[in-house]
Amino acid sequence: MELKTLREKSADELKAHLIDLRKEQFSVRMQQVTGQLPKTHDIRRVRREIARVKTLLGSTK
């Protein structure tokens, strides 16, 4: 998701999105461990998106 669209969301929406990203991160990690992850770049993508959301949440306080 682009930073522009993330900035338009409220803090509650960002928190909900963060929870979804954490679930996705867990799923991607489990796929990696079991050898079922065809796109290894998904790990990095999810990690960076989590960082973006957490940065925005910290700046809105």
From Swiss-Prot:
Top-level taxon of the source organism: Bacteria
Keywords, in A-Z order: Ribonucleoprotein, Ribosomal protein
One term under GO cellular component: cytosolic large ribosomal subunit
Spans through the membrane: none
Molecular-function annotations in GO: structural constituent of ribosome
InterPro entries to which the protein is assigned, alphabetical: Ribosomal_protein_uL29, Ribosomal_uL29, Ribosomal_uL29_CS, Ribosomal_uL29_sf
Keyword presence, Cell membrane: no
Keyword Ribosomal protein belongs to the record: yes
Family: Belongs to the universal ribosomal protein uL29 family.
Name used for this protein in its record: Large ribosomal subunit protein uL29
This protein's encoding gene: rpmC
